[in-house]
Regions:
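A conserved acidic beta->alpha catalytic loop
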Residues: 39-48, 95
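Cell-envelope/extracellular polymer assembly enzymes that use nucleotide-activated donors
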Residues: 7-9, 34, 187
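Acceptor/aglycone-binding surface of glycosyltransferases and processive sugar-polymer synthases
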Residues: 63-82, 87-89, 99-182, 209-219
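Conserved beta-strand segments of alpha/beta enzyme cores
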Residues: 34, 57-59, 154, 198-200
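Short, well-formed alpha-helical segments that are part of the catalytic scaffolds
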Residues: 15-30
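Hydrophobic helical membrane-anchoring modules
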Residues: 1-4, 177-266
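Short beta-strand/loop segment that forms part of the nucleotide-sugar
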Residues: 33-42, 61-62, 91
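Acidic helix N-cap motif at the loop->helix transition within catalytic regions
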Residues: 19-23, 44-53
């Protein structure tokens, strides 16, 4: 299949990335049809830097209020679908994702091998050495919980934000079910499972710049934990009660009742 004529859109959520956004935009491959940059109410010169880039493919969306990475992406995704994109790639504006690796994400979708592709830094053992130990441990824990919540047991590194999705699956997603914060990627996986989407991991190096992260770790850890637990229960309910009812459903009911009685009278 000739993928050179496919309509590819790249969505870039941009928040306080004045030092890197121009380089990121300059590195996007020429075969990309549309570049949609969402300035999520940056407090620095991000918007001015975006406007300084002369590229007719660029569409700038400016949020007056910060909507979070998920909110920014949903704005960009909607715009990409409106432009008739076949595949939509999500690329961060902090220069931690190599645009040259984009074909590795796009080709499996165009060739019918996957509906959604994502980077996996754990499949790149040499570059993985640059990942801080705290990130490794946190990512392993997050991966395990995400496997339970989403049902994608073959997927690793769920927080990796370098992704691509087919227009068909993107249009089928319910945006109301997608998180607006840094739980965005994980919530995408959970919702894609409901659509029986094929998800594929793509080896990708871990790149870390000297940019200061805007993530508040204690707050985001609490949000991730509670959101994952909620998604786990949502998956159990959807799979064993809403869409089907099997012997496992009965076991879950009986087991829950026994635990309840044991907790009260045990």
């Amino acid at each position: 299949m000739d993928n050179s004529k496919a309509k590819i859109a790249v969505v870039i959520p941009a928040y306080n990335v004045e030092n890197t956004i121009v380089k990121v935009l300059g590195g996007i491959p020429k075969n990309v049809s549309s570049i949609i940059v969402v300035n999520d109410a940056s407090r620095d010169a991000t918007e001015a830097r975006i406007k300084s880039v002369r590229d007719d493919r660029i569409t700038l969306i400016s949020h007056k209020k910060n909507m979070g990475v998920g909110g920014a992406l949903l704005s960009g995704y909607s715009c990409a679908l409106g432009k008739g994109a076949q595949v939509v790639v999500k690329l961060d504006g902090d220069d931690q994702m190599d645009p040259a690796l984009m074909p590795n994400l796009i080709d499996p979708i165009l060739n019918g091998q996957a509906d959604y592709t994502k980077g996996n830094r754990f499949l790149h053992p040499v570059a993985l050495r640059s990942m801080p130990p705290v990130r490794k441990v946190g990512n392993l824990a997050l991966t395990f919980l995400t496997k339970i919540a989403s049902g994608y047991w073959n997927v690793f590194d769920p927080a990796n934000g370098y992704t691509a999705i087919s227009a068909a699956k993107l249009a089928a997603l319910d945006p109301r079910r997608i998180a607006r914060n840094y739980f965005f990627e994980t919530s995408m996986l959970c919702e894609l499972r409901k659509l029986n989407a094929v998800v594929m991991d793509v080896p990708m190096p871990a790149i870390y710049q000297n940019e200061r992260s805007s993530v508040r770790l204690p707050r985001e850890f609490f949000i991730f934990s509670t959101s994952l637990i909620a998604r786990i229960f949502d998956r159990i309910f959807s799979r064993y009660f809403l869409y089907d009812f099997t012997a496992v459903s009965l076991y879950l009911i009986l087991g829950s009742l026994l635990c309840l009685f044991g907790g009260i009278w045990g």
